[in-house]
Amino acid sequence: MAGNSIGQLFTVTTCGESHGAGLMAIVDGVPPGLALSEADLQIDLDRRKPGTSKYSTQRRESDEVEIISGVFEGKTTGTSIGLLIRNTNQKSKDYSEIKDTFRPGHADYTYSMKYGFRDYRGGGRSSARETAMRVAAGAIAKKYLQDRLGVQIRGHVTQIGNEYSNVAEPSKIDWDFVNSNPFFCADKEAVSRFESLIDNLRREGTSCGARLEVIASGVPVGLGEPVFDRLDADIAHAMMSINAVKGVEIGDGMAVAGQFGHSSRDEMTPDGFTANHAGGILGGISSGQDIRVSIALKPTSSITTAGKSINTQGESVDMLTKGRHDPCVGVRATPIAEAMLAIVLLDHYLRHRGQNADVEQPLASIT
């Protein structure tokens, strides 16, 4: 199975299934000398892990990460960092009744058709369980970017179902509040609406989609490799690799179709840019402004409302999903999106440093 790695200089390779023994990652390209401990990674893993509130899946995993290589006496050695998380709360019997049935909206059918064989327990490799290793690896990237460059990467949920957050401007976001509520939402009033919505979804046996934004502040000018490795192209690729993501926007995104040139261009003055419609990326290269990425996640298809599907013999069946599932997968997606943005940014920083370390910029950054 190909497609388990991302990055060129900072690379992350993951393996593991939802109901297997555990999850693993090999993180390569981390510069030596970075102070790093398991506690540094655990912070974001605890933000993502299941069973932390009644608004997400009730599968309870400690998601305790073990660093098994690449760190000595509290610092990275420059060699590959091995990470391990053991699964402890599998309930594979929840899936025994559907081993011969394809769940609609999931990867059961496509995995079976592609490989001729599949792990039906919780979706196997296609389960969002695998994103725990992305978060662990991304925490390494976030720490390097923060410690060495002062880059901050933070996300917040802007929409769940048909309810919206009314706080969008980064300067108005209380990040402590975002990380103190189960929805990673910046709008205190929206949190109560989200709570009611999730409660209703559970009663109705259905689910809903979500939208969230990730913001990277302090990114230096110059990251990105035109033309095929544009920074925004690689960010979009990374975000689309997250389970359930069906849309990615950078800056104003799809809204640019209704804009006009005189108002949508990010004009410049000696004191800085007057706007950030482009989301911090111009010509595939970071401009030094905040990089703003928005993603949309579809409703999970694992719901307690019966639906139609087929079995492995191609026969029509009525499908009812059992097990422990998120009524809205977007609730726990914020640290995953942060991790993927961090992975891309560190990879591009190392690539930029390798080729352009001696470049003398013609003027100081205006941001």
From Swiss-Prot:
Cofactor-binding details, from the entry: Reduced FMN (FMNH(2)).
SUPFAM superfamilies on file: Chorismate synthase, AroC (SSF103263)
Residues binding NADP(+), per UniProt: 48
Swiss-Prot/TrEMBL GO biological process terms: amino acid biosynthetic process; aromatic amino acid family biosynthetic process; chorismate biosynthetic process
Keywords tagged on the record: Amino-acid biosynthesis, Aromatic amino acid biosynthesis, FAD, Flavoprotein, FMN, Lyase, NADP
Keyword Repressor: no
Pathway terms, separated by semicolons: Metabolic intermediate biosynthesis; chorismate biosynthesis; chorismate from D-erythrose 4-phosphate and phosphoenolpyruvate: step 7/7
Superkingdom in the source lineage: Bacteria
The protein's Enzyme Commission number: 4.2.3.5
Catalytic reaction(s) noted: 5-O-(1-carboxyvinyl)-3-phosphoshikimate = chorismate + phosphate
A GO molecular-function annotation: FMN binding
Cellular component, GO, one term: cytosol
Record-annotated disulphide pairs: none
InterPro entries: Chorismate_synth, Chorismate_synth_AroC_sf, Chorismate_synthase_CS
Record: residues binding FMN: 125-127, 243-244, 283, 298-302, 324
Family matches, as CDD domains: Chorismate_synthase
Transmembrane segments: none
First-level EC class: lyase
Cofactor: FMNH2
Subunit structure: Homotetramer.
Homology family: Belongs to the chorismate synthase family.
NCBIfam families, A to Z: aroC, PRK05382.1
Job description of the protein: This reaction introduces a second double bond into the aromatic ring system.
Protein name: Chorismate synthase
Organism placement in taxonomy: Bacteria, Pseudomonadati, Pseudomonadota, Gammaproteobacteria, Moraxellales
Gene coding for it: aroC
